[in-house]
A protein has these predicted regions:
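A short, active-site helix/loop in glycosyltransferases that binds the activated sugar's phosphate group
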Residues: 134-136, 172-197, 203-205
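Short N-terminal targeting/anchoring amphipathic segment
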Residues: 96-104, 113-130, 147
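Active-site proximal beta-strand in glycosyltransferases
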Residues: 6, 124-129, 135-154
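A conserved mid-protein helix/loop that constitutes part of the nucleotide-sugar donor-binding site
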Residues: 19-24, 225, 229-248
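Nucleotide-sugar donor phosphate/pyrophosphate-binding loop at the beta->alpha transition
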Residues: 105-112, 134, 151-170
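Glycosyltransferase donor-sugar binding loop
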Residues: 39-45, 230, 255-260
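N-terminal strand-loop element at the rim of the active site
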Residues: 8-15, 32-99, 196
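Acidic anion/phosphate-binding donor-loop and adjacent secondary structure
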Residues: 155-162, 186, 202-224
Length: 260
């Protein structure tokens, strides 16, 4: 059987739910069936070491790396690109009223013009994060099928809808992580509602069990229930529900420790 060529495009592999989900997906793929390339806008992150060895991490996109990397040494190597990054970022923020919109503007008016296309052609190409990864997928990748991913409730992202609609129309499917997120996308883009599909963030039980055996943190209490909540401290993550649950446990006289 001829192996299919697949590309994943991602911002980085720093700590985050989308990053963890991507690594889990890569660990579940059958590499006897797929040749997999991974393109990172920033070739870094705590999950890099967990990427399967069968995955080819593309490492020759110097223009892309310089535009998205804050490394001063890299900036000195490529002063022209560094200048575009600084000027483009400054003008984009002046032209818009949010970080999200400024990054959309920066891609459309600055980065899109100088980031080169990938030369390799793919059977399937996947932008595993919304915004610039999706724009790169549409503008710079040749693939028979293109899939975009939205890992948040779209209405909370603060994007220019008109720009995203233009790009969503050019992909085959837009995957999101919950029925609520899909409903929100369909309400924002009713003309392409059939493109939105749901695939919850993937977890690997094998990886979780392996990591659990590595060590016990000093905060771990063997004689009580340990509850760990991980995430950004903002309204979207809903940490107030964890506090409500902790109160109920206390009322029920359950011995526990809560860690945030």
């Amino acid at each position: 059987m001829e192996k299919r060529n697949v590309l994943f495009v991602m911002s980085s592999l720093r700590n985050g739910g989308a990053e963890r989900s991507l690594v889990n997906l890569l660990q579940l793929l059958d590499y006897d069936r797929y040749n997999v390339d991974l393109l990172l806008f920033q070739n870094e992150g705590m999950f890099l070491k967990q990427v399967p060895k069968a995955v080819n991490i593309i490492s020759n996109c110097n223009k892309l790396y310089t535009l998205y990397d804050n490394n001063k040494a890299e900036a000195l190597k490529h002063p022209y690109l560094s200048a575009i990054h600084m000027i483009g970022t400054f003008i984009s923020r002046k032209k818009t009223n949010s970080v999200a919109k400024s990054r959309q503007y920066r891609w459309e008016h600055f980065y899109k013009k100088i980031v080169p296309e990938l030369t390799k052609e793919y059977d399937v190409a996947i932008a595993y994060m919304q915004r610039e990864q999706t724009y790169f997928l549409v503008d710079k990748v040749k693939a028979a099928k293109k899939i975009a991913w939205v890992h948040n409730e779209y209405s909370q992202l603060g994007h220019f809808k008109e720009m995203d609609l233009e790009y969503f129309e050019k992909v085959d499917k837009v995957v999101t992580i919950s029925d609520l997120c899909a409903k929100d996308l369909k309400e924002n883009f009713p003309s392409i509602a059939e493109k939105f599909v749901v695939l919850p963030n993937l977890t690997s039980s094998q990886v979780i069990r392996s990591l659990a055996k590595e060590f016990y943190p000093p905060e771990f209490k063997r004689d009580m229930l340990n509850i760990v909540s991980i995430g950004r401290l903002n309204a979207q993550k809903g940490f107030e529900f964890a506090l409500d649950a902790a109160l109920e446990l206390k009322k029920s006289k359950v011995s526990f420790i809560g860690l945030f």
